[in-house]
A protein has these predicted regions:
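Short aromatic-glycine-(Arg/Gly/Cys) micro-motifs in beta-strand/loop hairpins
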Residues: 7-22
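A short, exposed loop/beta-hairpin motif centered on an aromatic-Gly-Thr core
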Residues: 23-32
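Short, charged, surface-exposed hinge/linker loops at domain edges
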Residues: 1-3, 37-73
């Protein structure tokens, strides 16, 4: 399975990695690589827990990420 991960610079240090398709699945790390490694482990644990509980595993649907520039008034 593949999931989109959003990486954001942390407020105080490092990076935060969020998985929009898996609500509440978030991790962090000092570097981007650390954050991605950690969130991969979080995704695996999240999916495993769903399967153990007999719950459906969310499947990501195709999405487009678009940046729009807007004028401030």
């Amino acid at each position: 399975m593949k999931y989109t991960v959003i990486l954001e610079k942390g407020d105080k240090f490092g990076y935060v990695a969020k998985v929009p398709t898996l609500k509440g699945c978030v991790s962090q790390g000092r570097t981007k690589a650390d954050a991605l490694k950690n969130v991969k482990e979080a995704i695996e644990a999240y999916v495993e827990a769903l399967m153990e509980d007999g719950l459906p595993v969310p499947v990501e649907v195709a999405t487009d990420v678009v940046k729009l520039e807007v004028a401030a008034k």
